[in-house]
Amino acid sequence: MADATLTELQALLGRLQAAQRELIFTAARAAMMPADGTLRRISDLENTIAAVEALIHEQRPGKGA
């Protein structure tokens, strides 16, 4: 995989993590249980983050990609 693509994946990972972090902080500041939709978005982001991390790991030089 080209270095540019790896850089793009890393940038995407950073954006996903920032979005998830903001949702979690917002939920923590609320005085009640987060809405189901918020919990689902946090969970969906976690799954997407894991997928992007796996892709980055697979595509790093020396990983047999």
Model regions and ranges:
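Short, charge/polar-rich alpha-helical segments
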Residues: 1-17
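A short, structured beta-strand/loop element
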Residues: 19-22
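Short, charge-rich amphipathic interface segments used for partner binding and complex assembly
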Residues: 24-65
